[in-house]
Amino acid sequence: MANTTFSGPIRSENGFKNISKTASTGVIHDRTFGTSPKDARRAYLEENFLQRPGINANIDQVSTVEVQRALNRNFETLGTNYTTALTTFAVTGAGILMTTATADQDQGILLPHLDTAATAWAGTLWGTENSVHFETSLQIPALDNQKVWTGLKLTNDQLVATDDDQMFFKYQTDATNSEAFTDFTKWHFVHSIGGTDYISVLPITVATNTPYHFKIEVDSDRKAAIFVNGIQYNVTTTAGSTGGTAVTTGTTKTAALTDDVDLIPYVGIENGAAAAEAVNVHFLACSRSVYE
């Protein structure tokens, strides 16, 4: 592609996209982060983890305590047997590495600091009626005995059946302490509308140490579109809390989500055996209309 020089401002009615093309396959990827350029009709929050998130008890210590002073003010961590020390800055990638403890079903979960008035991440409502956009990038160092999930949920639980309204991506190696999937090698997209669950099996076989850029975009009709590494995928209309329906690339969105439901952004990992598992989170971002 040739370089072009402009002497005046570049104008586009619907924004710009950062596009790349895989030479071997010809597949086009939208590598845009957020909305480009940013739109004055939307509010944006972006977390690049300049500080490590810690558990709530450490964040709430008086600021004369060295551990508290070093921790992230916007995000915290929690989970079964999780401690602040289990979150480190990633050595081989950007962002943070969350590593579970070593007992079966130990967890590491990342979420906004939910104490009252602690951060705009929790004070801002990510409602289904707010045209919310969610995105994060993560990678997994190993693919054994684990469950990884990220998206917008009512609670931090990884089970499909827990939340009546939700939108999240999930990978799990087995059904232990979880629901049965038809294919445990693939990324899945789970969404629930008023207690009815839908599981889309994406044609993406999970690989180790591979960055996955997940994006969920809810439009003004409360319908969600999903993207992985800049490629849009269809969302199934077949209801079910187990198994899953295979989908392909395409533009089919969810049906209209339940109106006026405020969701919380999460990233989580749970081990499925007596061994530590980890997830590397590069960044997390959300935006919404400035007024519903």
Regions found by a protein language model. Name each.
Residues 49, 136, 282-286:
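Extracellular beta-strand elements of beta-rich domains used
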Residues 190-213:
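Short, aromatic/His-centered strand-loop micro-motif at the edge of beta-sheets
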Residues 1-38:
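Intrinsic low-complexity, repeat-rich intrinsically disordered segments enriched
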Residues 134-136, 210-219, 224-226:
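Short tryptophan-centered beta-strand motifs in secreted/extracellular beta-sheet-rich domains
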Residues 30-79:
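Extracellular carbohydrate-recognition regions
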Residues 246-292:
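Ligand-recognition surfaces built from glycine- and aromatic
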Residues 227-231:
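Short strand-turn-strand beta-turns centered on an Asx-Gly dipeptide
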Residues 98-186:
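Secretory/extracellular carbohydrate-interaction modules
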